[in-house]
């Protein structure tokens, strides 16, 4: 049992540091955060949108920006991984009274699973590398995510009499009366476009140990490098006129340029603004984080072994060892019971289905501009893998799988429109020019299906050493997606 103790001691040592990850918040008080979870909420500055005069536009984008950050973080924490199966099956030799490598030339699936186990007191070690270059989320290109928002509604009586802000003409304002009594600068709105670059290098170490002939335990230990950059183009559309100076060109809302002027200063200046008033600004940031991801431990039991057909069941436990604040992990315990069918032959079909239940995570909670962040439940998932392996030669097996998941209650990015309240033609806003629809992004909670095709091969380099190559191809647009995900790996059975 020394190998078993070694394997599980190693797993616990690796997992322990991440189990105590503390919660954090993305402040909007001028204090920047270097955590990846804060990149989108702070994309327009660490004070929120407090570059405009008196922060009138402050905080408006975050109801839609935060769910996008949630969707990115959640899906990064649930990337598909190769199966921790050995690829080299063992059979019991009655003459030798021990397990020996099977004469079956089929080396098994890559993303799928087969019912057979590694054999008693056998140890399998594997390593794989995957590269994700994400280019879309729910069918929307990551390099051009639009987001538009109005200024906050605010009563004109909020300001002192010396600040000439009479209630504005209500023409074009929402019919629910939420903007009635607001000054005319509430007609101003902002158009933004987010160019998001997101790349992940994922390294996974696999350990499998056979306890008995039909029962094995395994672990997948990921280490990821996540590189993220965001370029945000923001434009303030001035639909109102300020009556008198010191407002530059009689405009209320503008970015503070880095030049001397007589206007009341906002809290933060924008480096790329060189004229006054400045209505266009570009914000950019990039970060890279490397660390341990969520360790997955598995127990699998083969409860039926026929001449060719095998059936097995098991349980995956995803431990919250990865830091969710840096998109390295989910921040929640996940449990996935599963069942496996496989058929042993030169052409070997197989199938696996499972249902994952998740705990509460900061990724789905409230983490922006709050001193007391909260957690909420991650969406549950139904997962399935179906495919076949073909023994091309004694040393080469080709593998094909359909890898799918149904995510329940996920945050989905959808196209939407913001209504322009209309522009004032003078400082008294006696005449309003009607506005039109403005492209933006919205978030809705819905069930989504994510489907990929896996195509690859295993090559037996030596008796117990296998090399694996694979590509994962997206078959639909739902979720955070890369067109092609390459994988390379090595595995060995002791």
List the predicted regions and their residue ranges.
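Extracellular loop and loop/strand-boundary signature of outer-membrane beta-barrel proteins
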Residues: 110-112, 189-193, 281-286, 322-327, ...
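Transmembrane beta-strands of outer-membrane beta-barrel pores
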Residues: 129-135, 221-227, 294, 303, ...
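Residues on the lipid-exposed face of transmembrane beta-strands in outer-membrane beta-barrel proteins
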Residues: 107, 111-114, 125-129, 205-211, ...
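Residues that define the transmembrane beta-barrel architecture of outer-membrane proteins
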Residues: 107, 119-121, 199-205, 290-295, ...
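Outer membrane beta-barrel transmembrane domains
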Residues: 143-159, 164, 241, 245-281, ...
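Outer-membrane beta-barrel translocator domains and adjoining extracellular loop/strand segments
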Residues: 137-142, 230-236, 313-316, 323-331, ...
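Outer-membrane beta-barrel biogenesis signature
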Residues: 22-174, 415-417, 444
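Repeated loop/turn-to-beta-strand initiation elements of outer-membrane beta-barrel proteins
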Residues: 134, 215-219, 306-310, 347-351, ...
């Amino acid at each position: 049992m020394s190998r078993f103790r070694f394997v599980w001691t190693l797993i616990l040592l690796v997992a322990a540091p991440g189990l105590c990850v503390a919660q954090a918040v993305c402040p909007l008080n001028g204090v920047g955060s270097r955590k990846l979870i804060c990149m989108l909420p702070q994309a327009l500055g660490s004070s929120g949108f407090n570059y405009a005069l008196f922060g009138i536009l402050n905080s408006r984008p975050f109801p839609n920006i935060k769910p996008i950050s949630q969707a990115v973080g959640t899906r990064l924490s649930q990337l598909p991984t190769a199966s921790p199966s050995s690829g080299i099956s063992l059979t019991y030799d009655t003459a030798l009274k021990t397990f020996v490598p099977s004469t079956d030339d089929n080396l098994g699936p890559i993303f799928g699973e087969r019912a057979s186990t590694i054999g008693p007191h056998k140890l399998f070690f594997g390593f794989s590398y995957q590269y994700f270059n994400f280019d879309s989320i729910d069918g929307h290109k990551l390099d051009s995510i639009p987001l538009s928002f109005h200024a906050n509604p605010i009563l004109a009586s909020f300001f002192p009499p010396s600040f000439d802000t009479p209630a504005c003409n209500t023409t074009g304002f929402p019919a629910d009366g939420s903007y009635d009594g607001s000054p005319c600068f509430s007609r101003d709105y902002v158009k933004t476009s987010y160019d998001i670059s997101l790349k992940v290098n994922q390294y996974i170490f696999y350990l499998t140990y056979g306890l008995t002939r039909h029962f094995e335990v395994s672990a997948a230990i990921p280490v990821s490098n996540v590189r993220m950059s965001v370029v945000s183009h923001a434009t303030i559309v001035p639909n109102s006129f300020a009556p008198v100076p010191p407002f530059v060109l009689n405009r209320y809302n503008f970015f503070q340029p880095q030049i001397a002027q007589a206007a009341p200063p906002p809290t933060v200046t924008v480096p790329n603004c060189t004229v006054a008033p400045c209505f266009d600004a570009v914000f950019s940031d990039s970060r890279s984080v490397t660390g341990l991801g969520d360790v997955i431990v598995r127990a699998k039991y083969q409860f039926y072994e026929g001449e060719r057909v095998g059936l097995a069941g098991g349980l995956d436990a995803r431990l919250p060892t990865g830091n969710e604040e840096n998109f390295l992990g989910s921040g929640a315990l996940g449990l996935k019971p599963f069942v496996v069918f496989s058929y042993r032959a030169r052409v070997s079909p197989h199938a696996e289905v499972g249902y994952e239940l998740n705990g509460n995570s900061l990724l789905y909670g409230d983490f922006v501009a709050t001193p007391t962040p909260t957690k909420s439940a991650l969406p549950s998932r139904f997962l399935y893998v179906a495919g076949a392996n073909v023994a091309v030669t004694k040393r080469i097996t080709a593998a094909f799988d359909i890898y799918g998941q149904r995510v329940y209650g996920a945050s989905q990015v959808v196209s939407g429109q913001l209504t322009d309240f209309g522009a004032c033609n003078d400082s008294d806003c006696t005449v309003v020019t009607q506005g039109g629809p403005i492209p933006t992004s919205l978030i809705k909670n819905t069930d989504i299906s994510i489907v990929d095709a896996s195509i690859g091969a295993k090559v037996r380099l030596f008796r117990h050493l296998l090399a694996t190559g694979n590509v994962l191809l997206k078959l639909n647009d739902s979720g955070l997606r890369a067109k092609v995900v390459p994988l390379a790996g090595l595995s060995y059975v002791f």
